[in-house]
Amino acid sequence: VLTAILALSAYIFILSPSLLNLDRNAKADSLNITNVVMQYVKRYYVDKSAVHPKAMLVEGLNRLEQIVDQVLVDFPDGEDGATFEVQVTGEKATFDMSGVNDLDLVTSKLEQVFEFITPHLTDNDLKISDIEYAVLDQMLMSLDQHSGIITPQIYKEFMIETEGSFGGLGIV
């Protein structure tokens, strides 16, 4: 159910004029997609007991470290600890995650992390939106094996591939 909702939201993002006008290499002023997805999870995810905001944040940060070579994420007190550190091209920042018990706080923490790493990224091939989608996908997979999000580009390709019609055989 959540996958269908997220696919629908991706479709809406494709057709939304405000999102179409975004710069493809936009900086992390705000993570619009993250906020929308977290609101969908809060409102529509059926199994509320599976939603663990801090664990979702940790999963997302681990994915961030995997896909962005320059970023290192460390949990000095373990993944259940009160802080985490993010290092990017020699710069390091410590973030508090002791009070992360709500999906709105997860969004806020991710915004802080993206605001920190974005100016230091040197790989021009990486787009902030692609990184955001990958992080979100990992966070949603922590809910259950069927939850995830796809990028608007992949969704658009999927819809084109499944588009079409069947003709009759000419039998009366």
Each language-model region and where it sits:
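Flexible, low-complexity junctional segments that flank or bridge functional domains
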Residues: 1-172
